Amino acid sequence: MNLAVPAFGLSTNWSGNGNGSNSEEESVLYQRLKMVEELWERVLQSECGQELVDLLTELRLQGTHEAITSEISEEVIMGITQRIEHLELNDAIRAARAFALYFQLINIVEQHYEQNEQQRNRWEASQETNFYEQAGNEEEMVPPSRLGASTEPLPVGIDQNELQASVGTFHWLMRELKRLNVPPQHIQNLLDHLDIRLVITAHPTEIVRHTIRRKQRRVDRILRKLDQLQGSVTGRDWLNTWDAKTAIAQLTEEIRFWWRTDELHQFKPTVLDEVDYSLHYFDEVLFDAVPELSKRLGQAIKETFPHLRAPRANFCYFGSWVGGDRDGNPSVTPEVTWQTACYQRGLVLGKYLFSLGELVAILSPSLHWCKVSQELLDSLERDRIQLPEIYEELSLRYRQEPYRMKLAYVTKRLENTLRRNNRLANPEERQTMITMPAENHYRTGEELLEELRLIQRNLTETGLTCLELENLITQLEVYGFNLAQLDFRQESSRHAEAIAEIAEYMGVLTTPYEEMAEEDKLAWLGVELQTRRPLIPQEMPFSERTRETIETLRTLRHLQMEFGVDICQTYIISMTNDASDVLEVLLLAKEAGLYDPATASNSLRIVPLFETVEDLKNAPGIMDSLFSLPFYRATLAGSYHSLKELQNQPPDYYQIPTTTALLNPGNLQEIMVGYSDSNKDSGFLSSNWEIHKAQKSLQAVAQSHRVILRLFHGRGGSVGRGGGPAYKAILAQPAGTVDGRIKITEQGEVLASKYSLPELALYNLETLTTAVIQASLLKSSFDFIEPWNRIMEELACTARRAYRSLIYEEPDFLDFFLTVTPIPEISELQISSRPARRKGGKADLSSLRAIPWVFSWTQTRFLLPAWYGVGTALKSFVDQDPVKNMKLLRYFYFKWPFFNMVISKVEMTLSKVDLTIASHYVQELSKPEDRERFDRLFQQIKQEYQLTRDFAMEITAHPHLLDGDRSLQRSVLLRNRTIVPLGLLQISLLKRLRQVTQEAETSGVRYRRYSKEELLRGALLTINGIAAGMRNTG
């Protein structure tokens, strides 16, 4: 098999901007890209014929444009468009499918390369001293860990991209902390209360089927096998070995099977389908990755600070919204949430049972050759009495093997636990289930842990170590019996509606609740929250919506009783506008038995979510009013008694992170900040600045009330929804707001890119953990320089005005958006259990969710939400004093982590924008009578883009976009060269589809040649392909 020549168009001498040579590692990447590309071509040739391959070759070669900042010419666009317009629908669909498959294959190769690169970087970091020590110039350098970047030149021989690759690992971090003379006791204090929580969410635009994800993993495994073969065979003939030929044949067949598989969901997934999808990442990767993360951190600490203790094993913990998030999703019912908890427990118990089977094979020591403690012998005797059937079955086989006998009892109890869980998942059996004897199964993971630790102690006392047993214990410490904590979320208006209906039925208010002023609501709610008298009658004669709201809190209570409090402690209130929104949920929690007014004890953490810019501005005042209520403060402390003890402590007691009382979850308030709706509301720059300010203010309010704050960041996958590299984002948080605690959403769309492969998962978890420790110990003071804050306030206000003047004040913009983007067709995708609009809203921007909003602009190559308004803001500031202010903005970029993060995200987004393609969406999808007004809007967008791009390149001093991130630059350029034809295919299919739809609506006559369903399928396939090509949905 000859793989020496690529099928088409990948330049082998590209180095990011066209001026340089590839590294050895990039050469390996391009070898794999060529191989996969040629196999893709061969499969298409055999499946569809040479004519399709020739068509794809022609379209791709015409669409190729080299530089990352250049746009394809109108002449080329017209040539491709004319070719596409003459395609039969079946050929257009096949072309769309082929391009989508191509991009997904390229993604796998890149992801595979990234995984190898991350392994190599980690190994180098563990072997070498840091770069500054190698260069012998450390005294003169300002560490990038503190500043985000430095204006001083790097030491001789150190490349900026090389330096970036070295940071983010535990070994690098610990050496950096030592180099900066951070006191070991400060490091230990932080490690002792390190608390990182990652929350998996379902994603309304998660476009890739589960079936396709499995194929992606199989392709990756074959690529890994080829890497091993290439590394083990010397010389250039490794491709001619029998093993290599076999692997390439397997890869060819995987691509062939993929081509013959439907890319689109054939039905709208249920919530439980989404639960299954999210649990897959735990099953395949995360179950083993998180314990490995703990080991890696412990090893790095030991090598640099041998006297420090590693953090507890579950310092990084996963939660989930899938099955618990009912905001705007009527499909998430109490029964679905219960089923989700059972599914999670069933998966983790099955993993433990498999591990126990492995231990039985390993732990074979005999009493003939080793001793065991009396404690273990006593436990075996108790087991014999409690589980006599196991003794009768296995006592002869294991009579001299105490560990195997013990594991047999443990296995039986765990099997009974799993059997009981399966019956709990069945609604019919749940009602009639006979309770098992307590000694025959485990109620909690801690009970199983005690038995495994008993075995571990015996092994240690006799000089034995079992790595597999240690791994299982760590997994139990991390995942328990629930795998992930379920967060509940509901919109604030649902609780207000329920309280209003309850109050009206009970006749307890003279004024309807919904008409009361905020201070009157707080007064009445305060009274109700300080009495044990129930408010809700048992029969619940209310509307279905109110009954469901009440039942949700009761289900939460039942889940805690059956699965333990850890299964669900968090209740998030979206669209929190007032303090009463929080107290309404607390009142419903009281009625469900989750809160006792007499003692203030409770088992629920209520989390307000502030999403819009207005809510973010009001958030500090809302929390101040809540913290000022004695009964609310007592709920945070855990009880009135605990609050009194805390108030008797000295003032600085609450400012010292070493105090163990601060680790008490009862003294903690979690607050969530939303990136998606604030961005949609006010634009990228304003949103980021308002969130930054709100965090500082919330931290100050919490500290003034002696409350510990944990900020929950609702970051999306795209830049327009707060996405981007987590490492930079965490370092850009205001100083003092992280302090070893952070909670972040991991959106469904990014799960595959972060957690589909073990080393990728570990890399993401390690860089995230490194950033949290780094941000907590090396705090930047730049966030508190008042003149800088005033400048950012000015920039944010100007950007917000520019953004809203287009999005909300331009009367033609809504029509423009609905016409030139595929938002109507996106709603047809069978990809989510949740509707695209809130409350079944009408076609306006206020009801449209942020995710399809961003998804639509990404498809059309505008990517508008992630940059619009930034250029106007920067120009307005620079024009006041061009030389001085441009110098100041550059200084911000190189010194201030927050500003660096903002500009870096804008730069990355601009690299993906192609307004030449976007203009064709406008020209081809607009009606003749709309073109003049739509062209005016497009010219306004184009002017803002050019302005933003020019300023981004000027501030960063990059001759080309992304010159500071070679890997990302390479990836973006690779896609920009190929995605053009797919966008034009989408335009053609959308145009045909809308024409057919319009004719059917106006005349009732269907377009005879192609049905609406056929055209819709073709359009959806292009949406699928562009999402893969952009590596982004919403």
Curated annotation (Swiss-Prot):
SUPFAM superfamilies: Phosphoenolpyruvate/pyruvate domain
Gene3D superfamilies: Phosphoenolpyruvate/pyruvate domain
InterPro entries reported for this sequence: PEP_COase, PEP_COase_bac/pln-type, PEP_COase_Lys_AS, PEPCASE_His_AS, Pyrv/PenolPyrv_kinase-like_dom
Cofactor: Mg(2+)
Domain of life: Bacteria
One GO-annotated biological process of the protein: carbon fixation
Enzymatic class: lyase
Function comment: Forms oxaloacetate, a four-carbon dicarboxylic acid source for the tricarboxylic acid cycle.
Protein known as: Phosphoenolpyruvate carboxylase
Its EC number(s): 4.1.1.31
Active site feature: H203, K680
Gene that encodes it: ppc
GO cellular component, one term: cytosol
Gene Ontology MF terms in the entry: magnesium ion binding; phosphoenolpyruvate carboxylase activity
Catalytic activity: oxaloacetate + phosphate = phosphoenolpyruvate + hydrogencarbonate
NCBIfam families: PRK00009.1
Protein family per UniProt: Belongs to the PEPCase type 1 family.
Signal peptide (UniProt feature, chain positions): none
Keywords in alphabetical order: Carbon dioxide fixation, Lyase, Magnesium
